[in-house]
Amino acid sequence: MTKTELRNKYKQKRKELTRIDIEEKSIAIANLVLKLDIWHHTYYHIFLSIEQQKEVDTDLLLHVLQGKDKQVVISQSNFKDYSLKHILLTDSTPVKLNKFNIPEPQDGIEVPTEKIDVVFVPLLAYDNHGNRIGYGKGFYDRFLKNCKDDVVKIGLSFFKP
């Protein structure tokens, strides 16, 4: 299958998920993440879910991270060069939907990519070798390439490879 075919297949699978499916699967994913040996790190990058894309609901993980007093980092998308700017999430960080309905920080304290210890990666599709397919713009490919060598990457998906 081509990347486009895989992308379409998994977008369709997501469309078929009900709100209850998303909630139950997101809770199961959060419970799996809680069991991982990742909680000694400081900076955790998490994506804020795009509801219309039926992504894994990261609100649960966000609450876990905040409950463990971790430094939570979210990103702002630059659609001119397909890069991400990373912002520390605080109680005063304004978050709004951009024109593509992606929740993003409007401004705040910028965090350099090399400070990030753990990245929760949105997965549309993936394989057993760590290859992923996203929405096709390469935001996360560029971001992950610039992370430090020992960054912990945790892919979040409703579906197995």
Predicted regions, residues:
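N-terminal active-site beta-alpha-beta segment that forms phosphate/nucleotide-binding
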Residues: 1-103, 109-114
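Conserved phosphate- and dinucleotide-binding cores of soluble alpha/beta proteins
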Residues: 80-161
